[in-house]
Amino acid sequence: MKQERTSKVKGLIKVIALVVPFLLNVNAFASPAESAGVTHDSIAAVARTEGAHAGEAPHGEAAGHGEEKAGDVIMHHILDSNVYSFEPFGEIVLPKIVVGGFDISITKHVVTLWVVSAIVLIVFTIIGSKYKTMSPKTAPKGFVNAMEALVEFIRLDVAKANIGPGYEKYLPYLLTVFMFVLLCNVLGLVPYGATATGNINVTLTLATFTFVLTQIAALKAHGIKGYLAHLTGGTHPALWIIMIPIEFIGLFTKPVALTIRLFANMTAGHIVILSLIFISFILKSYIVAVAMSVPFSIFIYLLEIFVAFLQAYIFTMLSALFIGLASAHEEHADHEAGAAHH
């Protein structure tokens, strides 16, 4: 049993290493203006403008400018940009590349995607080498043991529970997505890190992978005839003119939900943290900073760590659920529908 489990983990690690490189530069979905975010020149201009007004404006207007500047700084941290700041040590201006109208520039979020992909490849390569040299009778320890527990959790509680028979062929993708989304979320909470999952282009690409895999699973399970028959909803031909558009639109609501859910949750958390921090600067009060800004920021930060894990789990679980629903046979679906009805 132990040897069989070890061989399965080895196989999963190999496939994961093959899937990860596809989760790289997704910036081509954005227009040049969107991907550039807040450029260095615009930030400098805002800073000069705010400095000029600060010496002239009355207290009320100065507070308004302070709020505006705080909003600019928050958006600078949230939006993608080709300027990677390492305050107070300086900044790195990343190259802008536009090919045939598509922006494939290297930005903060693209760098984060590369770093996350490298981490996933390195981690699973190390674990794979450990399993190659490990005796089947030897229990894994430390980090290897933790990763085996993670693999078993995704295998049993996510893939097998939501997909059912034949879940093994989708497990490498689910493991890769979970680790990828989790690391993207966590790196956004690290100093000088950027939250790639706070970029809707990234979440849209991840959701597109799930969408494509879901349609492939449906075609394999039901064939082209069964796949097209699903669009009619099993209704009378007279209702097809209504049901087919509804079912067709329904195909795209799932990836849209995945896209917005992950993007909104990760973006909102960072906005809340930065807003709480800037309250003390806007009001210019140390009392507010000590009594409210710092404690609430720490609380929200800890909550964001939990949300980082939760959103990675939810994205993976919903991906498995959509694959399971698409590949489920009619009798299995009817059985589930009957159980839900009762």
UniProtKB/Swiss-Prot annotation:
Gene Ontology MF term list: proton-transporting ATP synthase activity, rotational mechanism
Disulfide links within the chain: none
Source domain of life: Bacteria
Main location: membrane
InterPro entries: ATP_synth_F0_asu (IPR000568), ATP_synth_F0_asu_AS (IPR023011), ATP_synth_F0_asu_bact/mt (IPR045083), F0_ATP_A_sf (IPR035908)
Subcellular location: Cell inner membrane
Pfam families on file: ATP-synt_A (PF00119)
Quaternary organization: F-type ATPases have 2 components, CF(1) - the catalytic core - and CF(0) - the membrane proton channel. CF(1) has five subunits: alpha(3), beta(3), gamma(1), delta(1), epsilon(1). CF(0) has four main subunits: a, b, b' and c.
PANTHER family the UniProt entry points to: ATP SYNTHASE SUBUNIT A (PTHR11410:SF0)
Family stated for the protein in its record: Belongs to the ATPase A chain family.
The protein, known as: ATP synthase subunit a
Originating organism: Chlorobium phaeobacteroides (strain DSM 266 / SMG 266 / 2430)
High-level lineage: Bacteria, Pseudomonadati, Chlorobiota, Chlorobiia, Chlorobiales
Gene designation per UniProt: atpB
